[in-house]
Design a protein with these regions (language model features):
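Catalytic nucleophile-loop/oxyanion-hole region of alpha/beta-hydrolase
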Residues: 82-91, 103-141
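Short, surface-exposed "cap/lid" segments of acyl-processing enzymes
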Residues: 59-66, 71-94
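N-terminal cap/lid segment of alpha/beta-hydrolase-fold proteins
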Residues: 10-63
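Short phosphate-binding/catalytic loops that engage adenosine nucleotides
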Residues: 100
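Catalytic metal-binding/acid-base residues of hydrolase active sites
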Residues: 78, 108, 175
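Primarily recognizes the serine-hydrolase "nucleophile elbow" in alpha/beta-hydrolase
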Residues: 127-186
Length: 187
């Protein structure tokens, strides 16, 4: 599904097209794997302010000047506490296997009784995007964001508000109309 979405949204990028083509031939659903190694990095003082960095094991075919592109992944789950960045781990692993770094972030989520959390959530996502620029061997000019559901909403907000714009922003099934989502009792 991820590869098909990438294919329908992006047609100009050589490295994205290569990624799509190679994964179509191989299929994303290989034998079940043991969790790929990643580096967990705390980027803030709160326990939820961390990201897992997945880097290719081998030299990336997308390397330019020693740096590779990175996709910052923002998970969905209606901003609720029980949904974590673990939802995006398979995509992070697939990207790293294809030669693209993945920065799978966590952010503040709400639990029953919380109010006004979404502004903290947006702050977390903006801060994580800033931290991505400090990572070694990352090509910031070709770095992207991708979010699903609530993460898609956050990806759209980040793309609109960030001073350093992502090369590409992908919002998978974003919650783009918060009023309609609330009226429909989606969360």
């Amino acid at each position: 599904m991820f590869v098909k979405l990438f294919c329908s949204l992006v047609t100009e990028s050589e490295f994205v097209l290569d990624f799509i083509t190679s994964n179509r031939k191989q299929g994303l659903s290989k034998a079940p794997r043991i969790n790929m190694a990643c580096d967990r990095m705390q980027w803030g003082a709160e326990p939820w302010q961390y990201a897992d960095l997945y880097m290719p094991d081998d030299e990336s075919p997308y390397q330019k000047g020693g740096n590779i592109p990175c996709v910052m992944l923002i998970h969905g789950g209606f901003w609720k506490e029980q949904y974590t960045s673990e939802l995006m781990r398979p995509i992070a692993e697939d990207l790293a296997e294809a030669g693209i770094a993945a920065w799978n972030i966590e952010f503040k989520r709400w639990k029953e009784g919380d109010e006004g959390v979404w502004m903290d959530t947006l702050s977390d996502v903006m801060r994580a995007w800033g931290q991505l620029a400090l990572l070694p061997n990352i090509d910031v000019q070709r770095s992207m964001i991708m979010g699903h559901s609530a993460g898609g909403h956050l990806a759209l907000l980040l793309a609109a508000k960030a001073e350093r714009k992502p090369w590409l922003a992908i919002a998978q099934a974003p919650i783009a109309d918060l009023i309609a989502a609330d009226q429909s009792k989606l969360s």
